[in-house]
Regions:
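Histidine-acidic metal/acid-base catalytic patches
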Residues: 4-17, 23-35, 42-57, 174-190, ...
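Active-site acidic/histidine proton-transfer and metal-coordination neighborhood
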Residues: 10, 63, 70, 87, ...
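Acidic (Asp/Glu)-rich catalytic clusters
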Residues: 28-29, 53-58, 72-88, 101-114, ...
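Active-site beta-loop-alpha junctions enriched in small/polar residues
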Residues: 39-41, 67-69, 93-96, 122-123, ...
């Protein structure tokens, strides 16, 4: 190719590129495998475990997170998953069990295929300076033990972690945990709804602690009306206005949050709705997320 031909070809390529719409250059992403926290359908699981697991798969969910096995042995629960083409990368385990029964939780995780063991909650009497310091110590020890077993430990937040606590130097308990746990041993399962209700911006935490959030809970919140749940257990006090709702039906800007999934390190997205009344609720959330591009 001579110099003149090269210049003409380059100019032609520039014209074609300039004629493309701006949005064509922007890559879009979607959630490859939407997950469900089974607490959403807890009452249905108590009535018919196998049938409920099958229904979850039929909706389109590809993975689930356990919060108890609803009377089933780990092998029985795993068999139900395998039968329906589901996997369970994560499970919740109470703080008391993490302190006293961690070997059993690890054994269950290996049978079930869990890659994460998550502490889901800190009880109200422990939400003081000494309690948070103790929790950080327990989490670091648990993270070391689970890592040796090929499993990652994590903590799941609510909203009560975002109230300044005396004895922590005015810090938020959530910030205290981030600062006083080893980021390699202790990850965070960020509940995006409860963080928002707590007045915090998930993206700000993604920016300040990149890669710390491999798991997220996805549920929406609307300030309109009020449901039968006062959410005092999650928030630390009764909520007088607003209630949980299906993903896409509330006020949370999911596209803005999920555009930062790479920075956050998100690997698994679990829909949850404490107030779900039927399969219609997890179905609505699934359909929204399955179509969402960001």
């Amino acid at each position: 190719m001579n110099r003149r031909t090269f210049i003409e070809a380059s100019l032609a390529a520039s014209v074609v590129a300039a004629s493309r719409p701006v949005w064509a250059a922007a890559a879009t992403h979607h959630i490859d495998r939407v997950g469900l926290q089974l607490y959403t359908v807890r009452e249905l699981l108590k009535q018919d475990f196998d049938g409920t697991i099958a229904k979850v798969a039929q909706i389109g969910y590809g993975e689930v997170e356990f919060a108890g096995n609803y009377g089933k042995s780990p092998k029985e629960a795993r068999a139900a998953l395998d039968k329906n083409g589901l996997v369970s990368p994560s499970a919740h385990s109470p703080l008391a069990d993490i302190e006293k029964k961690l070997p059993e939780a690890i054994e269950t995780a290996h049978i079930m295929g869990h890659k994460f063991i998550v502490c889901p909650y800190i009880e109200a009497p422990q939400r003081n300076a000494d309690g948070w310091k103790h929790a950080a110590e327990v989490f670091n020890r648990a993270g070391e033990a689970t890592q040796k077993a090929g499993i990652q430990f994590a903590y799941h937040n609510h909203s009560f972690e975002f109230a300044p606590t005396e004895g922590l130097g005015g810090k938020l308990p959530f910030d205290f945990l981030l600062a006083n746990t080893d980021p390699k041993l202790v990850k965070i399962e960020m509940d995006l709804c409860w963080m928002t209700v707590g007045g915090q911006d998930p993206v700000a935490y993604f920016n300040s602690h990149p890669g710390r959030f491999p798991l997220v809970h996805v549920k929406d919140w609307t300030k309109e009306g009020h449901g039968s749940n006062d959410y005092s257990g999650a928030v630390g006090h009764p909520v007088k206005e607003g209630h949980m709702t299906n993903v896409g039906e509330g006020s949370i800007d999911w596209k803005r949050i999920f555009e930062q999934s790479g920075k956050a390190g998100i690997q698994h997205y679990f829909v949850e709705n404490d107030d779900a009344k039927s399969f219609d609720d997890p179905r609505a959330s699934y359909e929204y997320l399955a179509k969402l591009q960001f």
